[in-house]
Design a protein with these regions (language model features):
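Amphipathic repeat-derived elements
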Residues: 1-5, 55-57
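C-terminal cap of thioredoxin/glutaredoxin-like
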Residues: 3-6, 11-32, 100, 104, ...
Length: 200
C-alpha cells in the first residue's frame, strides 16, 4: 500500500479551501489516500514573523483578485468572508476529536466547515457555529460540545500543531508525499506530476 499524502491546512486559509476541493481526487488517481491535518497558521506566524496575506499592502488586493479568479477556474463556489481571517482552534479541535473516532466523518466535517466559511460567508470560529455545522454532517451535538471543553482535546490539537512545525510546515495548504514537501495550491499540478513520474 502506497504512503498517504499528508495535507496540512488552516480552516482560515482560502488557498487551503481551494486545495481541499482537489486533493482527494488527485490522490485517488495515483492510488493514494489523503490524511487531512488542520494546523494553526497563527502559531507559525509567531515563529517566522509572517502575517496574513490579506493584511499585506498591495499583496492583499492581488490575493483577493487571485482567489476569485482561481475559484472560477476550478468552478468552486467562493466568497471572501466578511470576517477574515479568523482564529480556528475550535474547528480544528472538533476535527481531531471526530477524526480519532471516525476519520471519514472528520473529513466530511472539514469539507462542511470550509464550505460554510468560504462559500456561505459563515464565521466558523465559535463553538456554537462549529457544533451546528458538525451536527448537520452527523456528529453528536452533546458529545462534541462536551469535548470542546476537554483539556485533552485542546492538548491533542497543540500536539498536532507542534508536530507540523517540527516537520517544517509553515503554510496552508502544505503537502508531504513520500517525504517530499509541496507548499501552495498552485503546486498541486507539480505534486500530480511527481506522483505520476516518481519524482525528479
Amino acid at each position: 500500500m502506497a504512503n498517504p499524502i499528508d495535507f496540512y491546512f488552516d480552516f482560515s486559509s482560502p488557498y487551503g479551501y481551494l486545495a481541499s476541493t482537489r486533493i482527494d481526487a488527485l490522490a485517488a488517481r495515483h492510488g493514494r489516500s489523503v490524511v487531512w491535518r488542520p494546523h494553526l497558521l497563527g502559531a507559525v506566524f509567531k515563529i517566522n514573523g509572517q502575517q496574513p496575506l490579506a493584511s499585506i499592502p498591495l499583496k492583499g488586493n492581488y490575493t483577493a483578485h487571485d482567489l476569485a479568479r482561481s475559484a472560477r477556474l476550478l468552478k468552486v463556489p467562493f466568497k471572501l468572508p466578511s470576517k477574515f481571517p479568523i482564529g480556528t482552534p475550535t474547528p480544528s479541535r472538533a476535527f481531531y476529536w471526530v477524526h480519532d473516532r471516525e476519520p471519514a466523518l472528520a473529513k466530511r466535517l472539514a469539507q462542511a466547515l470550509y464550505s460554510a466559511y468560504f462559500a456561505q460567508d459563515r464565521d466558523i470560529s465559535s463553538p456554537e457555529a462549529t457544533v451546528a455545522i458538525a451536527t448537520k454532517v452527523g456528529v453528536d451535538k452533546a458529545e462534541l460540545e462536551q469535548a470542546l471543553n476537554d483539556p485533552a482535546v485542546k492538548d491533542r490539537l497543540r500536539a498536532e500543531v507542534d508536530a507540523a512545525i517540527a516537520r517544517g510546515v509553515f503554510g496552508s495548504p502544505y503537502f508531504v508525499v513520500d517525504g517530499e514537501p509541496f507548499w501552495g495550491s498552485d503546486r498541486l499540478d507539480q505534486l500530480d506530476k511527481w506522483l505520476e513520474t516518481g519524482g525528479w
